[in-house]
A protein has these predicted regions:
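Solvent-exposed, non-transmembrane regions of integral membrane proteins
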Residues: 1-738
Length: 738
């Protein structure tokens, strides 16, 4: 039959994506360095596990994995969509066609002109087990969360406005779990690998994945409302379509280059920005047209009557989540909006924007989560909830913690008080939902109570978030070999710092507290490909209540410490000093240009080599073409009517989200005669601050901080994950009966 033939043709397309994926893995393990993707993200000494995960280390491989996940999700969707299959699969094939078009523009199989003997290597901060599993879980979440959009579009086209929601609920549950797990895995990776002491930095690219998860959460609650009460049909269709559009928008922000100066995760423009922008506009127009056509036939939300407490709770929670998603989306899109209004001066918002707008909403959300298990779908829910409050201590604890919010805000100050209030409300929400989970499990079985366990996990997460932000702030310390220093309650002693021929730096320390035996700790710094600094991994001392976080920022081996500074370079007369930089994040390097205050010239640092003591620059005069220069220390080059001098390297810095920033001090002056030659016989060296000589033996710079209750955060993530998994099992069982 024709439908059966269409199914087999689609399976054939899924097998084709599988074959392409197997081919890419074969190239990665076969060290096919004539393939640009293999050369850019692997090397001969890369362990097999990271050769496997290099598949999604770059944008081209990520697109292919997303297409692979979407292809096989579609195979299951074709069976699960039942009578909506023709319309749903038509839309799904359009989604897969978009991914295929992006792969044709950015193919992971593009060839180089020659075959290098070795690859450039994988960024050290990507060589981590958490990062090996974080991206595929995220892309699986993107694929699964797209299913409700396909079913919603099918429901609109076929006028089956109830049927699509029944079929979508299991997929929305699985998408919520997968995308949420991906976000958590990224947070764990950031905390344990990047060394900035946090797990969420409000980076625009991180936010762009959070927003569809938030709108998907609204959709999930709305689908439950529609299943139980037959309401929320209009907002459900809107949020199903909106979540898919936000997934496309997230991809556009990440890969269009618009966030290149605002995110350490962003890729440069990959050539698909026009395609993605066009796809977003086209899909949005199609969705809007179908909605306008069918909207009058979609039942309006019913008026909530007195006593329908749980339904009101769902609506209020959805409004709060929508408000959080709006503010996160607004802050994330600020670089794009300001770039359109002022192309030469795009700007972004600071993390404080998200904290200020999100904290009150988070407090309100926790109150609603704490009240949820005390309500029911019964019209008499208000009386039942009141009786529950009187009978149960968890309910009283939730109400009591809510009453303490204003008192604590005034007593402890707004920020600290808000964090303590957040922790108390999280405790109340967790307690109330755990109590309801146990009670419902005994009455109806464990899977039926999974949502309450997930809510309890969310409450615990906020307890951990609040506690970890109330710890001792970073305290920096610099140690020379053989030196001991006390930081907080800890004593740190540096035994040695050594470098290897491969450029890896190893520091050996003894860390002790009081009369406890000293811990022997080994810290490593691995060079980032391209000679653009080092990636340092922190040491975390874990205990039941608090993590102590030791984050290295600089490690100088003994042989480099022993060198004496060469005579300082004499700057050009009348020169202005600029400090262009290269910023290296988990997704690669990006230049950070420096412009003269009068706009006469911009200097971009393209590459730097500490070993040879040279830099590669692109000098862009205001009234002339760009000029590419390679300069050694002290050397002067000519760019139009300007003399450009490389004076010395700036300090290596590590940003708040783990990115490395390497700069160079460049002097620019009006040209005077012939540019002088570079100083001869100068030994390449690394500058010491202020020209001071360091004692031989090596040195390390470390910051120490504490993270109270962060273990509760990870526990909450695990509890929420288990509860979500139980809910997914329940919804798919129910879906099989629909």
């Amino acid at each position: 039959s024709s439908p059966e033939s269409a199914r087999w043709l689609y399976v054939a397309s899924a097998l084709a994506f599988t074959a392409a994926s197997v081919a890419l893995w074969a190239h990665l393990f076969g060290h096919r360095f004539d393939v640009a993707y293999v050369y850019g993200y692997t090397s001969r000494d890369l362990p097999p596990g990271y050769l496997f995960s290099a598949f999604w280390a770059g944008p081209e491989g990520s697109f292919l994995f997303w297409a692979l996940a979407g292809a096989w999700t579609g195979v299951f969707l074709s069976r699960a969509a039942k009578d909506l299959e023709p319309a749903a699969m038509s839309f799904w094939c359009l989604c897969q066609g978009l991914l295929t078009a992006m792969l044709l523009i950015n193919s992971p199989f593009a060839l180089l002109d020659g075959t290098p003997p070795d690859g450039a290597g994988l960024n050290p901060i990507l060589q981590d087990p958490w990062m090996a599993i974080h991206p595929p879980v995220m892309f699986l979440g993107f694929a699964v969360f797209s299913v409700p959009a396909a079913l919603a579009a099918a429901g609109l086209v076929t006028n089956r406005l109830d049927r699509w929601a029944e079929l979508s609920l299991p997929w929305a549950s699985l998408g919520w779990l997968s995308l949420g797990a991906g976000l958590v895995l990224g947070g764990i990776w950031a905390y344990e690998t990047l060394g900035w002491g946090g797990y969420w930095g409000w980076d625009p690219v991180e936010n762009s994945s959070l927003v569809p998860w938030l709108t998907g959460t609204v959709l999930l609650h709305g689908l439950i409302l529609q299943r139980v009460r037959g309401t929320a049909q209009r907002p459900n269709i809107v949020y199903a379509l909106l979540t898919y559009l936000l997934i496309l928008y997230s991809t556009f922000l990440t890969r269009s280059g618009v966030l290149g100066d605002f995110s350490v995760h962003s890729f440069s423009d990959l050539g698909v920005s026009g395609l993605l922008a066009g796809a977003i506009g086209t899909v949005a127009a199609v969705f809007a047209g179908i909605l306008a056509w069918r909207f009058p036939r979609i039942p309006a939300p019913a008026i909530i009557e007195d006593g329908q407490g749980k339904e009101l709770n769902h609506y209020l929670t959805s409004w709060v989540l929508s408000a959080i998603a709006f503010f996160v989306l607004l802050g994330t899109s600020t670089p794009l909006i300001t770039g359109l209004l002022a192309p030469d001066r795009p700007s972004g918002v600071q993390p404080r924007f998200y904290n200020v707008t999100g904290a009150p909403l988070a407090l309100g959300m926790l109150v609603l989560i704490g009240l949820c298990p005390l309500m029911s779908w019964s019209p008499r829910a208000a009386k039942a909830a009141a009786a529950s409050f009187r009978r149960n201590v968890p309910g009283l604890a939730a109400a009591g913690s809510a009453l303490l919010v204003l008192i604590l805000l005034f007593a402890l100050g707004a920020e600290r008080g808000a964090l303590v209030s957040l922790g108390l409300l999280g405790t109340g929400a967790a307690g109330a939902n755990l109590w309801r989970f146990v009670r419902s499990s005994l009455l109806s079985g464990v899977p039926a109570a999974g949502a309450y366990l997930a809510h309890a996990g969310v409450g615990l997460m906020f307890v951990g978030i609040a506690g970890s932000n109330l710890g001792h702030p970073e305290e920096p310390v610099r140690l020379q070999s053989g030196q001991s220093r006390s930081v907080m309650e800890w004593t740190l002693k540096l035994n040695s710092v050594e470098g290897s021929p491969e450029g890896i730096v190893t520091a050996r320390l003894e860390i002790s507290r009081g009369k406890q035996p000293a811990r022997h700790v080994v810290l490593t710094g691995k060079p980032v490909p391209g000679g653009q600094g080092y990636a340092f991994k922190p040491y975390i001392h874990r205990s039941a209540l608090t993590d102590v976080y030791f984050a290295p920022h600089e490690m100088v081996p003994a042989e480099r410490e022993a060198r004496r500074p060469a005579p300082a370079v004499e700057p050009l007369k009348g020169a202005m000093r600029l400090a262009p930089a290269i910023v290296v994040g988990d997704r690669g390097a990006r230049p950070e240009p420096a412009a003269a205050p009068d706009g006469s010239v911009t200097v971009r640092l393209e590459a730097m080599s500490v070993e040879s003591g040279s830099v590669q620059l692109t000098v862009i005069p205001k009234d002339g073409p760009p000029v590419r220069l390679t300069l050694s220390k002290g050397e002067v080059g000519r760019a139009g009517g300007l003399d450009v001098q490389f004076e010395r390297y700036g300090p290596m810095e590590q940003g708040s989200r783990g990115e490395l920033r390497a700069s160079a001090l460049i002097n620019v002056a009006p040209a005077r005669g012939e540019p002088p030659a570079a100083a001869a016989g100068r030994e390449p060296r690394e500058e010491q601050p202020h020209g001071e000589e360091e004692p031989s033996g090596g040195s390390v710079s470390i910051s120490v901080s504490t993270k109270p209750l962060i273990g509760v955060l990870w526990l909450g993530c695990a509890v929420a994950g288990v509860g979500s998994l139980l809910a997914v099992v329940r919804r798919f069982r129910e879906g099989a009966e629909v």
